[in-house]
């Protein structure tokens, strides 16, 4: 009994000292349908606000940051990040040469995916540092092309960190959500 008590006290001490890494709580993990909804909402917001809406997208405390995800926006034609709440150092910078840890040109792929189906957008898989985790994880990002005043082809995107979902599965979800008869909430 003394051994069990000592083990429990040691575990408690480790938890209090922050020596263990807790897995994210399910409520703290963004889902693909949330990413799609946030991207569509942000695209509509930018259509209404124009370039002045980028300031809201850049805010870490704004409506476009939730759980472990965030909306960001970039201009493929001008090769520039236009809004990124977690990486303000990227705003205004060239993006086409940015690669993930596996050498994938992330933004080139996102530009292709978002432009391939302008009415639906598309998904890209890559590895990226997860906010708050400090480690690289598999990420699926949904990107959707929108036009705003004086600027065409702005890509609005958000991602989810997931080791199980396939691009095919999230693409089917996008199709379902884009059809109001099947998904009346949108």
Residue spans for each PLM region:
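N-terminal membrane-sensor/transducer module of prokaryotic signaling receptors
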Residues: 2, 11-186
